């Protein structure tokens, strides 16, 4: 198993190299050269196993034998030992065929913990083995930053720099990034939106001299290992609901397309998924793209679901690569058009392939608030705004007799203002985070300029020691 770039002009890499590299040197994203395959019999054999045991079985083929089995098992056990629910990703039934998969039982109350806790341990292992250090950079629309900082805080071989849009994340999300006391953690409040933050991260990776000098590595879902870790909960959920002997549908609130692309990966690996439904807020570029066949950027609107206030969905490039039968030249042309003119057309055959696997829908701000209120009134279940988008769209895409699972991506207490406004309920933070809002903050406000960000990182990163070979 090795990994190839969606743009076809970077070298193929083994697992640990792809892990530490993040973004390919041609600007593309790494994907497995070949999808592992699981038979129905193998999927049935997962029944009755713990989340950790299933994770080991599903993820092992991706590691290419580069990590000893016992070491990999221990990493998985340690990563998910940080979760507050024994099932890691438990299911809650909200209707006859409707389920919510709760992905917020990790340390920062968001689905990003599922991948980030494992990613930190994988990176530690790879860096330790090589005697290297790394400078971790990440852009966040809210949840990635807190999850990454929690996972990497205090780790000796990494410095972490998280860029978030100043004034555009929830107060809880901001405190989870700005109250760490670890010396290796740096939170940068960028005077712009999430797309500005993401563009700065990509620009740093494309600045080869800077990238090599500070030993740059990434934790956004441009990093294949993030997607890989998220594949697991599609398998655990499907098996719990009778898979592979019945098909399951999933609705995923998404902006950057990473979480739902993990579902696509699971389907490619043999999991019998019926529908993968993209749920967007008013920043609906993914819904528009499926409808029109044209990917066109618009201005970002601020909503009550800030983690989805995105117009450039990085992981859509991975799906394009698959839809174009892995023709990297067509992906390069699309990405160049996006860069030059803010959009691109998807060829009819590729669009047909995408529509075969995906459906899409959007929820307005009014519909989000109404879904939070209605769900709580009818079932007693409290949703955060992102999960409410999923529930609203799922209700319109359900099929009789096919279970529909909505991924709940964050705890409602991360968005108390929106939740209280919609439901009248003031969601409390769990006891272990009760003092979060009283902690002292530490962050740097910075302009959305590459030079300013690189200068700050260059002054604070320790990654250029023990430089080693280029990645």
Q: Where are the language model's segments positioned?
A:
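PLP-dependent amino-acid enzyme catalytic core
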Residues: 1-471
């Amino acid at each position: 198993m090795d990994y190839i770039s969606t743009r076809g002009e970077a070298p193929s890499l083994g697992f640990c190299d792809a892990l530490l590299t993040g973004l390919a040197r041609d600007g593309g994203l790494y994907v497995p050269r070949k999808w592992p395959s699981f038979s129905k019999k193998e999927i049935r054999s997962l029944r009755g196993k713990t989340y950790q045991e299933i994770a080991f079985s599903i993820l092992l083929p991706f590691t290419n034998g580069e990590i000893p089995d016992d070491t990999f098992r221990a990493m998985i056990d340690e990563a998910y030992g940080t979760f507050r629910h024994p099932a890691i990703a438990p299911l809650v039934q909200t209707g006859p065929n409707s389920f919510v998969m709760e992905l917020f039982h990790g340390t920062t109350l968001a689905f990003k913990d599922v991948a980030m806790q494992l990613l930190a341990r994988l990176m530690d292992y790879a860096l330790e083995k090589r005697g290297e250090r790394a400078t971790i950079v990440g852009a966040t629309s809210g949840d990635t930053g807190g999850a990454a900082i929690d996972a990497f805080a205090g780790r000796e071989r990494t410095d972490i720099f998280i860029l978030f849009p100043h004034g555009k994340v929830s107060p809880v999300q901001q405190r989870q990034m700005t109250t760490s006391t670890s010396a290796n953690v740096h939170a940068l409040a960028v005077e712009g939106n999430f797309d500005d933050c993401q563009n700065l991260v990509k620009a740093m990776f494309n600045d080869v001299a800077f990238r090599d000098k500070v030993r740059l590595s990434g934790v956004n879902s441009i990093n294949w290992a993030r997607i890989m870790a998220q594949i697991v909960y599609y398998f655990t959920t499907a098996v719990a609901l009778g898979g592979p002997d019945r098909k399951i549908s999933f609705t995923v609130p998404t902006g950057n397309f990473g979480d739902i692309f993990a579902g696509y990966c699971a389907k490619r690996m043999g999991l019998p998924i019926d529908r993968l439904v993209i749920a967007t807020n008013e920043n609906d570029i993914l819904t528009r793209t499926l409808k029109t066949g044209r990917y066109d950027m618009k201005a970002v609107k601020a909503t009550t679901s800030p983690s989805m206030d995105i117009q450039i969905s990085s992981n859509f490039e991975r799906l394009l690569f698959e839809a174009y039968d892995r023709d990297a030249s067509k992906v390069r042309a699309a990405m160049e058009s996006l860069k030059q003119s803010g959009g691109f057309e998807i060829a009819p055959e590729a669009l047909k392939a995408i529509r075969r696997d995906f459906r899409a829908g959007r929820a307005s701000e009014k519909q989000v608030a109404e879904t939070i209120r209605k769900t709580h009134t009818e079932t007693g279940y409290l949703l955060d705004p992102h999960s409410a988008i999923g529930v609203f769209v799922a209700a319109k895409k359900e099929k009789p007799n096919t279970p529909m699972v909505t991924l709940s991506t964050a705890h409602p207490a991360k968005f108390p203002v929106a939740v209280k406004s919609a439901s009248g309920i003031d969601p409390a933070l769990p006891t272990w985070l009760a003092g979060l809002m009283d902690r002292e903050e530490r962050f740097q406000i910075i302009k959305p300029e590459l030079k300013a960000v690189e200068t700050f990182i260059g002054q604070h990163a320790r990654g250029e020691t023990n430089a080693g070979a280029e990645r």
